[in-house]
């Protein structure tokens, strides 16, 4: 909490720019975790500071479930894509919870490609919104949807195990209002 809040305050006080772009998270919307609460507080700092210093525009981006590849192995060992890539060699994958109130019992997420995030950031440099912009598609996919898609695209098969729910996982995280900065450059099939 302190890192996000104090770090944001230090950066915004030191950097003198006409357009401040802040990277937040979709979890700031519902504040269901300490991380989400800390990012929401940091968003408030950005908005208050930039509003009081009227010469400074801002855009706050709430990133939803960012996916995509840069040619290197993903670095989040808890992330879905990291574990799917790992399953190519281990030949097994674990889904955490299959008893959610969703179409197949697994969590639903709104995935957005990292290149779409970059595109939105570039647009905001040219035209800041002075508001919070949520980056997602407004369309959810279940974990099983993603696992099956991954298997099909990579023409592989592996065992899928079901483990207990992870602490803090929410049933569904799908964006309701899609930002105008989202150009829908990719679909999940891509």
Stretches found by the model and what they are:
Residues 1, 5, 32-40, 74-82, ...:
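Short-chain dehydrogenase/reductase
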Residues 2, 6-36, 52-59:
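Conserved Rossmann-fold NAD(P)-dependent oxidoreductase catalytic core, especially the SDR/UDP-sugar
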Residues 7, 11-15, 46, 120, ...:
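Hydrophobic positions on the long internal alpha-helix
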Residues 7-10, 19, 41-42, 113-116:
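Conserved cofactor-binding/catalytic machinery of classical short-chain dehydrogenase/reductase
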Residues 20-24, 59-65, 110, 134-136:
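Structural signature of the Rossmann-like NAD(P)-dependent dehydrogenase/reductase core
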Residues 28-34, 61-79, 102-103:
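Flexible, glycine-rich beta-alpha linker
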Residues 32-64, 83-89:
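Active-site Tyr-X1-5-Lys
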Residues 86-190:
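C-terminal substrate-binding subdomain of Rossmann-fold SDR/epimerase-dehydratase oxidoreductases
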């Amino acid at each position: 909490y302190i890192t996000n809040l104090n770090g944001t305050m230090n950066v915004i006080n030191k950097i003198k720019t006409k357009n401040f772009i802040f990277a937040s998270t979709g979890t700031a919307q519902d504040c269901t975790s300490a991380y989400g609460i800390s990012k929401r507080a940091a968003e408030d700092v950005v908005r208050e500071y930039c509003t009081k210093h009227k010469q400074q525009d801002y855009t706050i981006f709430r990133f939803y479930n960012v996916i995509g590849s840069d040619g290197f192995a993903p670095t989040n060992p808890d992330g879905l894509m990291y574990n799917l890539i790992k399953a190519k060699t281990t030949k097994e994958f674990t889904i955490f919870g299959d008893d959610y109130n969703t179409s197949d019992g697994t969590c639903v997420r709104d995935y957005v490609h990292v290149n779409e995030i970059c595109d939105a950031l570039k647009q905001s440099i040219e035209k800041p919104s002075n508001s919070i912009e949520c980056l997602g598609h407004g369309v959810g996919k279940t974990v099983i949807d993603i696992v099956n898609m991954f298997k099909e695209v990579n023409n592989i098969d592996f065992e899928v195990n079901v483990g207990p729910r992870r602490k803090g996982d929410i049933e569904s995280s799908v964006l309701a209002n899609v930002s105008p900065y989202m150009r829908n450059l990719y679909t999940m099939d891509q």
